[in-house]
Amino acid sequence: ETETTVAFKDTAPAAPLHVLVVPRRHIDDASKLTAEDGPVLADMMVAARAVADQAGLAGPDRGYRLVFNIGPDAMNSIPHLHLHVLGGEPLKGHFITS
């Protein structure tokens, strides 16, 4: 949790680690980001890296996935910008469906 973002576990995890990083300020989704939102996006990325670091996934022999879902075809059901942080196992074939 920072001044601009919060992070919490997804209620329907698609991987052993599945955390959502959410800005406190409302933005509908990633398609609505503007140049003025650069600091918000940067803070979200830094928070996502912190989540991965805390989970031990940021090392050279590990990895994690960051995902923005936009619109109904991407199965986005949350009308607020959020970044999925996934990891904890090889992610071949993992897709976010909610």
Predicted regions: what they are:
Residues 1-98:
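HIT superfamily nucleotide-processing domains
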